[in-house]
Design a protein with these regions (language model features):
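Long, compositionally biased intrinsically disordered regions
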Residues: 1-155, 160-164, 172, 176, ...
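Long, charge-dense tracts
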Residues: 122-273
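Acyl-donor binding region in acyl/amide transferases
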Residues: 144-154, 158-190, 194-198, 330, ...
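Short secondary-structure boundary segments
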Residues: 210-228, 304-314, 318-322, 357
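A conserved beta-strand-loop-helix scaffold within acyl/acetyltransferase catalytic domains
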Residues: 249, 253-352, 361, 365-371, ...
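Short, surface-exposed amphipathic charged segments that create phosphate/polyanion-binding patches used
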Residues: 393, 423-425
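Extended amphipathic alpha-helical segments with heptad-repeat/coiled-coil character used for oligomerization
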Residues: 414-423, 435
Length: 567
């Protein structure tokens, strides 16, 4: 998960204070009272506007009945006018810029988005973009880069202080939008997309996107043929069995057309960008490989992979955007190798009083179905390591009560001691200090009948570090030497002939060879093991990385070797 640099200020406490449980609880009488709605949209300041907006969004995703939904939709159409009215009254609107609540209709976001996202914005919404020159900092870099597009700029930029770069750009672009003009110039370069991105991203240009209502959180919604109404209490964590969900019947899934996939990826990029965020799978999602799954209870999930040119060298990557009654409520990121997946589940702040545990369990069921994964790893940050929001929310116990365990023995002992205290005193609460200790390491979930999978100490980073040490030890720290040697060795050991392979398959070979070359006696594998390893390499660069994972799950020797290298 990556986040574009935000120029907003604020904290997660703002939203936590604004969400009134009575306003968000579907079972509350207040959610359908006429008086509650008739007085609802009279914001006197930005904070009260946020409170009203977030409660309305929650009601839209979790409506109690058709009447509530209709009233909610009507109130949301008034949000942009409320923002404008507060602005006209010179109210302080800076709270609306906080990342936790950004994306409200009538506002904008400013961030140093990546080249890929800015180029996409230019394609979709060129008239809504502008450079925020107040945040222009990389003058030297700009002066060194832009002469290729601005003739004679060197005469100013190379020797003068306080160069009026904005004047140069304004004179050159004519009537073209300044952001669009810059992107057009970069696209004209005879370079790969990655090389263009490296140069553009080094400029750290802050782009303001003044989005329309449909792109805002206020107005963003997928059309739904059928709404699921919550006329009964929401599903709580105590009602969810992760083991039961993982073993539940298959979830209905279908592959979208290219046009449908493009629409979903547009929504995914929008819902991230208005929150100052970027996700690799949304930015580089493959429109040809988008799947739609129906989880039930009005919940749709769209799962996407990435094209071969943007894949990770070793792990398979999948992202998912999750809708509740047409409203985007969460996203998921899975980084997988063999049967192990690193799970990143992010519920948007507004919806954290919803059916979080059930939703997470259903997503994991879907990942097991699509990818064959049975071991789920949680990064310490998700649990609260260097993440005070995770500490405040008790994220550790959320995962622990679903069946996850700390992988470090010392943290498992602390966990069991805390559990004994809670069993003896129902009013006992783990202190923030203890939660920070518990969050220091990874957590893992395995199905009960699987036993210890051997993945406890594994980290992909360790595999990469082992490659670096070998490069320093045997190849004088020369990356070209270790690559060429590894490729030649693996091609010979596995009897690979790659001359007819696709570019993606060859790229996969070039990356995986660095790891395979470190496996002892790989040349002595059986013919069947070598043939399967070759299929695994090709699948990494093939159409769908799910095939890569499922083939890896069949190769016991490769799996064991990877665990040793990464542990």
């Amino acid at each position: 998960m990556s986040e574009a640099r935000s120029v907003a200020s604020g904290s997660s406490k703002l939203l936590g204070e604004s969400l009134d449980p009575v306003a968000t609880a579907p079972s509350s009488d207040a959610s359908t009272s006429r008086s509650g709605f008739s007085n609802y949209l009279q914001p006197m300041d930005a904070e009260s506007l946020i409170q009203q907006h977030e409660a309305l969004l929650f009601r839209r995703a979790y409506p109690r009945n058709a009447r509530t939904l209709k009233q909610t939709e009507k109130q949301l159409t008034k949000i942009a006018n409320s923002v404008n009215r507060l602005g006209d009254a010179d109210a302080d609107l800076s709270p609306l810029d906080a990342p936790e609540v950004s994306g409200i209709a009538g506002t904008s976001v400013t961030s140093n988005f990546s080249f890929a996202i800015v180029r996409w914005l230019v394609q979709k919404y060129p008239a809504q973009l502008a450079i925020d020159w107040d945040w222009f900092e990389e003058e030297d870099r700009f002066g060194a880069t832009m002469p290729r597009f601005l003739p004679l700029l060197e005469d100013d930029a190379m020797v003068e202080a306080h160069v009026p770069f904005r004047d140069w750009l304004s004179a050159a672009k004519g009537r073209t939008n300044e952001v669009a003009w810059i992107i057009e110039r970069f696209d004209s370069l005879n370079l790969s997309d990655k090389e263009k991105a490296e140069i553009y991203d080094s400029l750290k240009l802050h782009v303001t996107w003044r989005y329309g209502v449909r792109s805002s959180r206020t107005g963003m919604k997928r059309p739904t043929r059928r709404v699921f109404f919550h006329d009964k209490p929401l599903i709580q964590r105590r009602d969810v069995s992760l083991v039961g969900e993982l073993n539940s019947p298959a979830i209905p899934v279908r592959r979208l057309s290219r046009a449908e996939g493009e629409k979903i990826l547009d929504l995914a990029r929008e819902t991230s960008a208005v929150r100052y965020r970027e996700l690799h799978g949304f930015t580089y999602g493959d429109v040809r490989r988008v799947l739609k799954a129906d989880l039930g209870r009005g919940t749709e999930v769209f799962v996407m992979g990435v094209a071969p040119e943007n894949r990770l060298p070793l792990r398979a990557y999948h992202a998912a955007l999750i809708f509740k009654n047409g409203v985007p409520v969460a996203y998921f990121e899975g980084l997988s190798i063999c049967e192990r997946t690193e799970s990143g589940f992010n519920l948007y702040y507004t919806f954290r009083e919803g059916e979080t545990a059930w939703l997470y369990a259903r997503i994991l069921r879907l990942m097991r179905q699509l990818l064959g994964v049975t071991v789920i790893s949680i990064d310490p940050y998700q649990v609260g390591h260097e993440n005070e929001e995770g500490i405040e929310s008790g994220a550790f116990w959320f995962y622990r009560k679903l069946g996850f365990r700390p992988v470090w023995p010392e943290l498992m002992k602390l966990t069991q001691a805390e559990e004994r205290k809670m069993a003896e005193d129902r009013g006992y609460r783990t202190s923030p200090r203890m939660l920070r200790k518990l969050a220091a390491g990874h957590m893992i979930f395995e199905l009960p009948d699987a036993g210890n999978s051997g993945w406890d100490r594994f980290q992909t980073r360790n595999v990469g570090l082992a490659v670096q040490r070998r490069m320093a030890r045997e190849f004088k720290s020369d990356p070209k030497e270790i690559r060429s040697h590894s490729i030649e060795f693996v091609e010979r050991a596995l009897r690979i002939k790659s001359n007819q392979w696709t570019n993606g398959e060859r790229e996969a070979l070039h990356n995986l060879a660095l790891v395979l070359a470190m496996i002892p006696a790989i040349e002595k594998w059986s013919a069947g093991e070598k043939e399967l390893a070759t299929r695994i390499i090709r699948a990494k660069g093939g159409a769908d990385e799910a095939a890569y994972l499922k083939l890896m799950q069949r190769h016991a020797k490769l799996r064991d070797a990877l665990i040793r290298l990464g542990s």
